């Protein structure tokens, strides 16, 4: 099968993509076939001022002349949705879990920057409990790379990984041992709907308690990237790693849900040019999110 290329000159629409994700039948992953090569490019991407302001207000983030380090991922979200909902993609979107991210920002990105965003569904790995597949995104300004990421998704299933796993492994972050508790905050009950309106991520598990229960959760859950943004803010992770003047890398592993209307707290260890933190939800003794910000 030849590569699939999607090109955009403005922000892709999410509605049709969500419809395809919900309605179109999927063949399911087949190791003999693999994944199709799907690429997308959004030229002239620029942060919408109202959406950016709503993002900052909703997540209690401070204003800055530069974009938050996670924001290019938010901007590319609708492009990702259109790629994952393409008719040739064999995996049902609602059955996939956003598992990990590695983001590298090579320089601060001004809020009014005009970027080109390029994404590609890249490699996959067979693991014991299913399949991991990678999504790469690169942001350039005048041809210079300023930001990139690898998003790792997980699909549960029997694909042979238990007996014949892939040699390549994705990165991991283990829970901190005896970390200092450094902060806490409340994830409000309306966060799912507010964040979805800003980002276009209307996954039912964030919108409805009933829908979330159908997927095995006790109630609706917060968007992981929203909670991660708050954790980076509360932990002062970027400042501890040297500030936006330096090239920075953010690693995150989403290990469990953060429920809406819950109290969350932060534990962290800080070293020179590095900040390692875990986010806990309510009384759960295990962290829901493990993250790290380091200078590179």
Where are the predicted features?
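HotDog/MaoC-like acyl-thioester-processing domains
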Residues: 1-24, 30-35, 79-81, 96-184, ...
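A conserved acidic, glycine/proline-rich C-terminal tail/linker
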Residues: 235-269
